[in-house]
């Protein structure tokens, strides 16, 4: 078989890491606050909350403190992808454990600096956080500084590592495996003209791993079926992980030139690709969470 690749920018491969050690929920058994702090929703065992959509985006204790904090990655909180999926997990745990919680978005938005991220973590601690969940590998420098300063606070680094600090738990993923399965499934389902558009401008290790796995999975399926597969891939328009007219135009162009399905790998970028797919009667592969609820163009999510 022959696998054709058409590149539109991007570089910097990264090696996948294994999932980190202890989960952040170990803080729950050590609480000594007054009972008033347990007045978060769903404290009754028989009324467990199972949908994050049923929970408010923040819940405070009677003294105005928040025990669990979530510091967002770049992009929107409600990105229907990485940020939202992570925060939904935080909310579900907190609500069912009777803990107060709050989210923090670093100042600067898509242009947030390490100082902006540190300031968000510092504010979370000042507001009473005992556990701070930080999403995205870009949090590394700020988290290292905050964890060394606030040694009594536990930090959870999603898409990161423990950095040799006792109060940091790293949680990493093998994105290449999800990407591989998505590429393999797409080709086995009959798609032979694929696209991949990744967030982070080629510097995001997680998106890189998704992309490499996607190509390898498509290659393996093509060998099984004895078919030729062509793949367009691009890191353009995805540096901020945001939806954009430019990305939608690029995706529409790919579809018009024969691409059948595009793996939209990067937060709100999905919205642009899905809009193009809908207009061109084409297909999309989602990422991070099940995005089939967002568009009937989605054939699977990785």
Regions found by a protein language model. Name each.
Residues 3-7:
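C-terminal motif of bacterial Sec signal peptides marking the signal peptidase cleavage site
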Residues 12, 18-302:
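A residue-level marker of the well-folded mature domains of exported/periplasmic proteins
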């Amino acid at each position: 078989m022959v696998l054709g690749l058409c590149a539109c920018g991007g570089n910097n491969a990264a090696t996948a890491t294994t999932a980190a050690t202890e989960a952040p929920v170990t803080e729950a058994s050590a609480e000594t606050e007054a009972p008033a702090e347990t007045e978060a929703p769903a404290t009754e065992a028989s009324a467990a909350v199972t949908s994050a959509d049923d929970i408010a985006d923040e819940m405070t204790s009677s003294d105005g403190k928040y025990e669990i904090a979530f510091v967002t990655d770049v992009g929107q909180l409600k990105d229907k992808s990485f940020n939202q999926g992570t925060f939904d997990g935080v909310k579900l745990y907190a609500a069912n454990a009777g803990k107060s919680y709050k989210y923090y978005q670093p100042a600067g938005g898509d242009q947030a600096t390490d100082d902006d991220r540190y300031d968000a973590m510092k504010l979370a601690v000042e507001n009473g956080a005992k556990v701070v969940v930080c999403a995205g590998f870009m949090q590394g420098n700020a988290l290292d500084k905050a964890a060394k300063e606030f040694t009594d606070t536990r930090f959870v680094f999603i898409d990161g590592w423990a950095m040799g600090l006792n109060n940091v738990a790293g949680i990493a993923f093998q994105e290449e495996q999800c990407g591989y399965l998505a590429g393999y499934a797409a080709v086995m389902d009959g798609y032979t003209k694929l696209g991949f558009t990744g967030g982070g401008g080629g510097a995001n290790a997680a998106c890189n791993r998704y992309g490499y796995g996607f190509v390898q999975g498509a290659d393996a399926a093509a060998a099984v079926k004895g078919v030729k597969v062509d793949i367009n891939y691009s890191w353009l328009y995805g540096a901020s992980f945001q939806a954009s007219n430019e990305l939608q135009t690029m995706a529409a162009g790919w579809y018009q030139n024969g691409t059948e399905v595009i793996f939209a790998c990067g937060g709100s970028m999905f919205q642009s690709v899905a809009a193009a797919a809908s207009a061109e009667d084409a297909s999309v592969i989602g990422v991070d969470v099940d995005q089939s609820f967002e568009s009937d163009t989605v054939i699977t999510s990785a």
